[in-house]
Amino acid sequence: MVTVTELRATAKNLGIRGYSTMRKAELEEAIRDHGRVSEARVASPRRSPARSPRKSPAGRKSPSKSPAGRKSPSKSPAGRKSPSKSPAGRKSPSKSPAGRKSPSKSPAGRKSPSKSPVRKSPSKSPVRKSPRKSPAAKLQAGDRPASMNICKNLPKQRLVDIATEMGIDLNRESDGKPKTKDQLCADIMGGAGRKSPRKSPSRSPVRKSPSRSPVRKSPVRSPRKSPVRVPSPVRSPVKEKTPVRSPARSEDAGSDLAPRPRRGKAVRLDYDEDDDYSYGASTDNLFSGNKEIPFPTRKRRTRKPEKVFVDVRSPHTLTDSEDEDDMVEVPELEDKEITMPGVLSPYSDEIVERGYVSQGGADYINYIYRTEYALESDESFARGARPKTNKRDSDRAVREAAAAAAIARALDRRSQSGNDEPAVRRRSAPTDSSRESRRDREPQRDIAEPQRDIAEPQRDIAEPQRDIAEPRKVRFREAGSADVRVFERDEPKEYGRVPVRPPLFMPAGEPLQPLKFRPKTPKIDDTIHRAQMVLPSKPSQKETDNYYKQFAGEAVRPSEPVQWDKDDQVLYHKVPAWDDSSYAAAVSAWPMSVDPKQAESVFAEFEQLSAQDSDLIKVRKSIMKALGY
């Protein structure tokens, strides 16, 4: 009784493809077929596909190096020949069944593919069974497939058979190369295409195609081999190098996103319906609602958001305070996947409902980076780090106030550090619970009397304590308020540790003043133009004011009513009240640097305006302006 190993050796010598994966019975059958077929083959190269021995179950045609899900239970390490590559003919004109008894011919030593003697044989039909049966594969041998799609799903060999039968040339006219499946399909479906009688096409070497992958996903992407071997002199088997499988293509050989074009083949991009490319009705409100951003974003792995300490005492700067315990340096934030448009904006004072996204200038970035502010227990105060200083902070007073506050805080933290309990837990909310008054008193107290702070250490620690109970939106403090907040970030913020950023877009050439008369942006506005999604709508009055104030180094107090700029205030309150009766007198009394013509025009304007009964403030203002006040 022949062992599998012997059968394998025989099969190898005969050059049967796929022998290393076959079971014993299959091997015997293949060897038996072998002689019969080869005679028939040599006799008529154009044999009808009906006779083609596609029965031989050649297993999966993958390099046998990867034991992917190999069928063969008995796989001997000897069978190292990778069947899909070897261009060895399945038939060679060797003794037919007699061949089975010749394991003697192949000494066990020479099992490496480079040595196998009869591997290339003059006639060759690359027989392969399609890895999975597609419904199309059940067609009868002769007839041509019903539709292009079915055609493309057929195994290559099947196409080759049909083409041969229809008398279609298997090699391209342009270069002698074998046609790709798509080309074959086109020809087959296009009717019994141009029967160009060519001289027997020269044997083209096997293609090294990068797409050969350990587990073939679909029959469509099978590596291209020249479909028909025409008898030609035996070449030395050593020429054939093992193709390098490029590491870049993993087993998703045809990833949909950007298939690397194979040589000479057009790339077909196909997107399946339900992946990110759905541009539905949602495009009209790009950033509204909590939906994901509708254009495909690259997915990144997301870690759990760390808690990050942030010093928000002075809103637009970082302080220079050198106190170790004071702040914790923010670790570098890795790229996180951007999921939701932002909800909280440090710029708006009102607590905003969950779904609301401010469209205004200052929040433009904040609604892309969404931030949740939450207070956290104080264990983390322990791991101090030297605070980064921000060079933009040029404001001495701010820095000093903050530093003094920080030092005081550090001192009392040190004075209490006897027990391990975190400092903040120690005490209930302070008696003086009115934030406003305390905030106004603070900077002076912190600078002037650090001693009192040591005497009564709980005083400014206890305020964040109140927030631990019910975390609410962070309100920014003026410089001295000793208030270190913690907030949890799930998205990267670009710079520094402070979630405040000047608005992306300030109206271009406009002077400061006209900002004042801009109508407020409505809270929620679903009717936005496309353009406004890119250029955010104009910032609200309050945002603008705060923005300029912050750069002037003033503190922005959340609660205070909107104030005019200083010079406006002068304009409004220091101007003597006008009455129409004294107007002419006033004009005549005015220094003569104003030429009478101009005064005249001013007067005319005044008449016209008051005739329209527009409100006096506007009139007054325009007059003052015209008179060069």
From Swiss-Prot:
Taxonomic superkingdom: Viruses
Pfam family, one: Rho_N
Disulfide bonds listed in the record: none
Any single GO BP term: DNA-templated transcription termination
Region (Disordered): 30-155, 169-327, 376-474
Biased composition annotated in UniProt, kind: Basic residues: 48-58, 117-132, 195-227
InterPro entries: Rho-like_N
Record field: transmembrane: none
Basic and acidic residues: bias regions: 30-39, 170-184, 237-252, 305-314, 390-399, 433-474
Ranges of compositional bias, category Low complexity: 400-409
Protein known as: Uncharacterized protein 032R
